């Protein structure tokens, strides 16, 4: 799954040494941060889309109440998952952003 691969990459960078030959380059940190921010934007868009679908479905009159309930449950579960994924991603991105900032400062000082 693309999300787990991205999260694995982000977490690997956080666990990598901060200096020395095995430390990731600033370019690598920034490129991976960009990938993470792109995923965060996609998750935000998905959340908006799901919330809109939930609102439209809840406002709909008529139809099969059982089917509407199942669809609402499905959409709500997907929204909750997107919320959780986004929260976790934001935490990891924040930590990696701080790491990149420190690497940038170290590069400027050198």
Features from the language model and the residues they span:
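Actinobacteria-biased recognition of intrinsically disordered, low-complexity terminal regions
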Residues: 1-15, 104-110
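Short E/K-rich amphipathic alpha-helical oligomerization segments
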Residues: 15-16, 20-23, 45-74
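Short, charge-rich amphipathic alpha-helices with coiled-coil/heptad character
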Residues: 7-32
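Amphipathic alpha-helical coiled-coil segments
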Residues: 29, 36, 40-43, 50, ...
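Long amphipathic alpha-helical coiled-coil segments
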Residues: 86-110
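Short charge-dense sequence patches
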Residues: 1-6, 24-26, 34-45
């Amino acid at each position: 799954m693309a999300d787990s691969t991205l999260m694995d990459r982000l977490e690997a960078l956080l666990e990598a040494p901060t200096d020395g030959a095995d430390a990731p380059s600033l370019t690598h940190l920034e490129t991976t941060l960009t990938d993470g921010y792109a995923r965060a934007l996609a998750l935000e868009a998905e959340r908006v889309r799901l919330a809109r679908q939930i609102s439209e479905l809840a406002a709909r009159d008529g139809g099969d109440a059982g089917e509407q309930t199942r669809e609402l449950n499905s959409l709500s579960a997907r929204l909750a998952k997107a919320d959780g994924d986004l929260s976790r991603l934001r935490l990891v991105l924040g930590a990696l952003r701080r790491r990149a900032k420190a690497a940038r400062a170290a590069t400027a000082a050198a």
